[in-house]
């Protein structure tokens, strides 16, 4: 049975909604796969079947989704279809993206070969869960490989470049910090869009934040570690300033940690508001020692 892994937005959360570069990678530790209430009867499977049915009704009410075999989906739901997933909800690691990718993959009647059109179609599907979507999460879950989405241009739109699994330095390790707070994405994204209506905020975001996203991506994939951690610290501080509403108050000091003094650095993971925070380090032992004396649990990604 095919698995649809979770995803991590390493760089580009929020900014990619408006066409910035983004770097995404699979989160292999969590995944979803098709199952059946009949084969695995449980309250969770019944709830999954009911949730997919609600999504199915949304898809049926929009002609955009005619390229999906919705008749078959409806019949299989009647027969007990469910999606067995251990991807945590409200944690920014692709719970809805994996389901969208799985439905598209299983029920598509035609292929969508152009990346931008595929992304837009998946975004329209995922809007059901978040109110708005860039389409990047389900695209990542669908491809199942790390990739960079280029900055949008007038001429070429956005191009997708698949990366090798060793796209970053072997000395950099990634971990997730569990804030123990579940958070819905839609209100956070809507508030961000409202903030962008202020011209001074928009200017700082587009002219300082977005270029830093690109610098983080380039320095990481060029394996220039010192440059990377320097740009990452600048980005984290700007997230603290420009995306304060997405960072739980009790975790804000983490965004000021410096690799040189603390041994690790922290940024948002997905929409924020809780869920996981994303950490980067070159010293796993020192990082483990730091977090074992706190109330937070960490999960190693790489």
Predicted regions and their residues:
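C-terminal nucleotide
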Residues: 3-9, 15-17, 24-26, 33-61, ...
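Stable alpha-helical structural segments in soluble proteins, enriched in small hydrophobic residues
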Residues: 98-110
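Glycine-rich beta-strand-to-loop/alpha-helix junction loops that act as flexible
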Residues: 94-96, 269-274
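Gly/Ser-rich catalytic serine loop of serine hydrolases
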Residues: 86-98
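Generic structural signal for well-ordered secondary structure
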Residues: 26-27, 100
């Amino acid at each position: 049975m095919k698995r649809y892994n979770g995803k991590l937005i390493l760089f580009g959360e929020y900014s990619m909604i408006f066409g910035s570069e983004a770097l995404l990678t699979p989160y292999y530790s969590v995944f979803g796969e098709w199952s059946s209430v009949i084969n695995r009867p449980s309250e969770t499977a019944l709830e999954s079947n009911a949730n997919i049915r609600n999504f199915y009704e949304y898809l049926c009410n929009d002609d955009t989704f005619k390229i999906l075999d919705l008749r078959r989906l409806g019949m299989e739901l009647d027969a007990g279809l469910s999606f067995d997933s251990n991807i945590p909800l409200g944690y920014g690691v692709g719970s809805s993206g994996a389901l969208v990718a799985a439905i598209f993959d299983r029920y598509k009647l035609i292929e969508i070969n152009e990346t931008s059109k595929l992304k837009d179609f998946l975004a329209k599907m995922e809007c059901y869960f978040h109110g708005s979507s860039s389409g990047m999460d389900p695209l990542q879950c669908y491809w199942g490989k790390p990739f960079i989405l280029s900055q949008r241009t007038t001429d070429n739109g956005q191009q997708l470049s698949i990366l090798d699994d060793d796209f970053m330095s072997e000395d950099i390790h990634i971990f997730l910090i569990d804030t123990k707070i579940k958070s819905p994405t839609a209100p956070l994204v809507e508030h961000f869009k409202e903030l962008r209506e202020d011209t001074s905020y928009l200017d700082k975001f587009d002219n300082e934040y977005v270029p830093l996203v690109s610098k983080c991506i380039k320095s990481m994939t060029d394996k220039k570690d010192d440059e990377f951690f320097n740009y990452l610290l600048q980005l984290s501080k700007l997230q603290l300033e420009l995306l304060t509403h997405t960072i739980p108050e009790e975790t804000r000091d983490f965004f000021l940690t410096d690799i040189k003094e603390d041994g690790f650095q922290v940024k948002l993971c997905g929409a924020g508001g809780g869920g996981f925070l994303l950490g980067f380090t070159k010293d796993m032992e020192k990082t483990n020692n730091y977090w074992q004396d706190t109330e937070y649990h960490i999960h190693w990604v790489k």
